[in-house]
């Protein structure tokens, strides 16, 4: 599903900083992967590339057998929306929307009807043990509950 071959990334802020050097990685569908390393080792840069939030300089990145290079913003957003999930270290919920509405929001951008969005969001919340919190606002939830909703 994800294949990186010889990925390189350099930031040019005055002196060039080569943060990723020859990264090779294969992740199959259904695998759970952790990216670990020392501070400043390039973890966030790698994750930003995997999430199609940043470009790489050289190498090849294939997502579902599609080369991820020089995509239009529209195409990149489509792939992010349909094929990539994020769990951010810091997260944000929309404060004036309840748990169902926050969970359903990405489905809106996929053109799914409100009825189906809400049904799917309730199903996801149930899987996370949060069905009883579906209509609670973020300020009524614990930090852990908010993390799961996000």
Segments (PLM) and residue ranges:
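ABC family nucleotide-binding domain
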Residues: 1-150
């Amino acid at each position: 599903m994800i294949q990186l071959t010889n990925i390189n990334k350099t930031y040019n802020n005055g002196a060039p900083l080569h943060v990723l050097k020859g990264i090779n990685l294969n992740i199959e569908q259904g695998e759970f992967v952790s990216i670990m390393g020392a501070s400043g080792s390039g973890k966030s840069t790698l994750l930003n590339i995997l999430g199609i939030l940043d470009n790489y300089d050289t190498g090849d990145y294939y997502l579902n057998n599609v080369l991820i290079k020089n995509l239009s913003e529209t195409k990149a957003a489509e792939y992010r929306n349909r094929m990539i999930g994020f769990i951010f270290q810091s997260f944000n919920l929309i404060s004036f929307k309840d748990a169902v509405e926050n969970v359903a929001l990405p489905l809106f951008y996929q053109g799914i009807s409100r009825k189906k969005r809400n049904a799917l969001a309730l199903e996801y919340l149930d899987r996370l043990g949060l069905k009883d919190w579906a209509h609670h606002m973020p300020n009524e939830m614990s930090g852990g509950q908010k993390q799961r909703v996000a």
